[in-house]
Amino acid sequence: MKDTAKHQGLRNQLVTTLEQKGITDRAVLDAIKKIPRHLFLNSSFEDFAYQDKAFPIGAGQTISQPYTVAFQSQLLEVKKDHKILEIGTGSGYQTAVLFMLGAKVYTVERQSELFKTTSNLFPKLNIRPKHVTFGDGYKGLPNFAPFDSIIVTAGAPFIPQPLMAQLKIGGRLVIPLGEDVQIMTLLIRKNETQFEKHEFGEFRFVPLLEDKN
């Protein structure tokens, strides 16, 4: 698993692109500068790994474009040792960004193929999430709640109630809401019953899968 000076140069260019697109969080940009995105992709896409594009990763899923990863990560306002729930491990790239930001990451993946691939990949890259689970993201991880923040990396038609319940007071939930096109939505929990809602424009995500059993 090689990471070369050429890859590093391409990552530096990618970070410049993200800055030009409005990403300002230095810690997020530094994480993206360090993480070998090409190792999270099928080798046939390696030459394109540092373009600001999404790519298929199997099981009908995609690795989000770097801008989207940076945008969601910036909205979370991650602090060191924050306990973060990630719904949709996918390729594991977003997980790696959160880990590099110093978060304790609890991540859930619904697709067994991706779950196996990323579970094998993390140790090779020295990425150490606190907990990697195969399961239904709509349910969250109640046994590990509450969380400082929750990030959903797939489009959802509504905000799953269990996720709202598992957020700490003062916590932030970032979720792309909508059917075909999603509105990036931030919820901040004000108290037991009230949430403050902010919306940040249109994005496109694969749908969040619910366990129908």
From Swiss-Prot:
Q: Which family does it belong to?
A: Belongs to the methyltransferase superfamily. L-isoaspartyl/D-aspartyl protein methyltransferase family.
What keywords were assigned to this record? Answer: Cytoplasm, Methyltransferase, S-adenosyl-L-methionine, Transferase
What is the designated name of this protein? Answer: Protein-L-isoaspartate O-methyltransferase
Would the keyword Transmembrane helix turn up in this protein's UniProt record? no
The protein's annotated catalytic reaction(s) are: [protein]-L-isoaspartate + S-adenosyl-L-methionine = [protein]-L-isoaspartate alpha-methyl ester + S-adenosyl-L-homocysteine
State the organism named in the record: Flavobacterium johnsoniae (strain ATCC 17061 / DSM 2064 / JCM 8514 / BCRC 14874 / CCUG 350202 / NBRC 14942 / NCIMB 11054 / UW101)
Question: Mind telling me which GO cellular component terms the entry cites?
Answer: cytoplasm
Could you tell me the gene encoding this protein? pcm
Q: Pfam families under this entry?
A: PCMT
A Gene Ontology molecular function term of the record: protein-L-isoaspartate (D-aspartate) O-methyltransferase activity
From the broadest rank down, the organism's phylogenetic lineage runs: Bacteria, Pseudomonadati, Bacteroidota, Flavobacteriia, Flavobacteriales
